[in-house]
Amino acid sequence: MYHIDFTKPIHVHFIGIGGISMSGLAELLHTKGFTVSGSDAKDSKIVDRLRHLGITIFIGQKAENITEDIDLVVYTAAVKSDNVEYQAVQKHNIPMLDRADFLGQVMLQYKNAIGVSGTHGKTTTTSMVSLMMLEGNFDPTISVGGILDNIEGNIRIGHSENFIVESCEYKNSFLSFNPAHAIILNIEAEHLDFFKDIEDIRTSFHTFAKKLPDYGNLVVWGGIDRYEELIEDLSCNVITYGMFSSEEEREQNKDRYDYAACNVTSDDFGLRSYDLYKHGKFVDRINLAVIGDHNVLNSLAAISLVDTLGGTMSAIKKALLAYKGTERRFERKGVLNGITIVDDYAHHPSEIKATLIAAASYPHKDIWCVFQPHTYTRTKSFFHDFTTALALADKIVLADIYAAREENPGDISSKDIQNELLKIGKEAYYISDFAEIEKFLLEHCTNGDLLITMGAGDVVSIGESLLQK
């Protein structure tokens, strides 16, 4: 593997520079004096930001983008061996690193690199940890998998030994990372186009946890199935967190978690508050500016780590009040004719369930969910779970499956989910065309309704288009 000397800036080219992680890494290198160029299939706000920094951008991937003055090429997992730039790199014998290996080498430059992992909640928790450390004057470098308004983007360049990295398990990419501290939020079946089964996923997370050094800290949710096995044979310090449903349960299980939430309440807009306990003793009342019990757990994970690393409770509380959410995480887009339009990235049944349960505490008449399934593999693997989760909405509109990296196998469609929802008495519609979905919603949504566009594809454009009408 090619090893980078970060004291000697070179020319690095990124294939797929518009990706949320790749763009941040490109900006980080540019800030450190490296010559950076990159290509992407299409233009975007992220690409335009890089262009304005002075980074050379190519729209469209072509062999001529690969020149002999390039010293290293970094590429995403989505880039295949038949990619024209990939082939040109091999022809020129230029060293290559995939994004995960490259990021792993970057993390080695920071004594306190932090990896935030889990099937769900990574972006939110990474953002919460980041704001806590910013408020606590840790001056961290931050790489988050979404747009965080508080740092005006997805990357923040600090000048300390602290580096916060969202760490995804897909294709075992986080096993190339080198964290000193880590969070494991949850472990569920996901990315079954790569992992064999849930046991394969559990093994991957255990391997990730074993990468932590003796002086490191692993924060792990105590509600993970068989979490005791997850923390076996670890040399690092292990910190657990969880939520109690009542004071009686907490009193009977004081030693279950190192950090715990109890007496969770919500205001008229669904924003959560709770009592924080540390080692069984009351610490403070925590107020969040986001909705949902899943965000109580996300905030607990962030608190557990930052408090352990020396953050003050005043800074932690102030940061949580400042966190209004990340782009595409229950993001309030606007109001049209009294209809509140929200967008959410949820694309796994557990995420859909958490979002719709949280939405129920938000002021509304009917909850409309416009769902775009993401990948054929995921839709087939969790078909019945999708039906159960989506049934929590009052009315459901299903768009076509967003293929992403996959070919259509021809044996699964959004129409199949609609049929299952109709069987259980739900009001569900399948509409393939986005323009027709918009027309349908304008005709059927009424004043006081909550409209949620949901999915990891381009379904967000429906709400944005409606608000322009």
UniProtKB/Swiss-Prot annotation:
Would you kindly state one Gene Ontology biological process term found in this protein's UniProt entry? Answer: peptidoglycan biosynthetic process
The reaction(s) this protein catalyses: UDP-N-acetyl-alpha-D-muramate + L-alanine + ATP = UDP-N-acetyl-alpha-D-muramoyl-L-alanine + ADP + phosphate + H(+)
EC number(s) per UniProt? 6.3.2.8
Q: Which Pfam families match?
A: Mur_ligase, Mur_ligase_C, Mur_ligase_M
Q: Where in the cell is it found?
A: Cytoplasm
Cite the InterPro entries for this sequence.
Mur-like_cat_sf (IPR036565), Mur_ligase_C (IPR004101), Mur_ligase_C_dom_sf (IPR036615), Mur_ligase_cen (IPR013221), Mur_ligase_N (IPR000713), MurCDEF_pg_biosynth (IPR050061), UDP-N-AcMur_Ala_ligase_MurC (IPR005758)
Q: What is this protein called?
A: UDP-N-acetylmuramate--L-alanine ligase
EC top class named in words: ligase
What pathway does the UniProt record associate with this protein?
Answer: Cell wall biogenesis; peptidoglycan biosynthesis
Name where it mostly resides.
cytoplasm
Instruction: Keywords in alphabetical order, please.
Output: ATP-binding, Cell cycle, Cell division, Cell shape, Cell wall biogenesis/degradation, Cytoplasm, Ligase, Nucleotide-binding, Peptidoglycan synthesis
> What family does the database annotate?
Belongs to the MurCDEF family.
| Highest taxon of source | Bacteria
An example of a GO molecular function for this protein is: UDP-N-acetylmuramate-L-alanine ligase activity
What does the entry list under GO cellular component?
Answer: cytoplasm
The task this protein performs is described as:
Cell wall formation.
Which residues of the sequence carry a binding annotation for ATP? G118, T119, H120, G121, K122, T123, T124
Provenance organism: Lachnoclostridium phytofermentans (strain ATCC 700394 / DSM 18823 / ISDg) (Clostridium phytofermentans)
